[in-house]
């Protein structure tokens, strides 16, 4: 997909986990490696990772630091979109290591340019951190950050967006890993 960029959000402080989540191992590979593997067939080298951690440089994709630090995932999305050269962008948070190429490709196929965001919906809950973002939403994100309104869901709810119901077969891919307990359960 030449007209789209993959953006991996890996700049979080991982306070609940106590360590950098993207470097946690699952089946012998880091979380970030699993996500990159899912994105790579779709975008090749057209991938950005938002993180200040140089340990992510092994991936070989462009690593950028938050333009406006300490603004959470919204700041990471803003940074990724600012560095992106494409209109459409697939954003994936580093704490979702189970996403597959098939899910991301399907999600992108459901996106329409009528929407600024297409986010996934599982069991009535939206996931704006595995979503398609139109680069032009940078303006609204910049305004939200300036007003210190940092909740990604609030931003998405305030723009033209669509919620895409995830088929049953892919629901397990959207498990977020934020605590040591969740990580231990994932490894079982």
Over which residues does each language-model region extend?
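Nucleotide and nucleotide-moiety/phosphate-recognizing core
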Residues: 1-149, 157-171, 180-181, 187
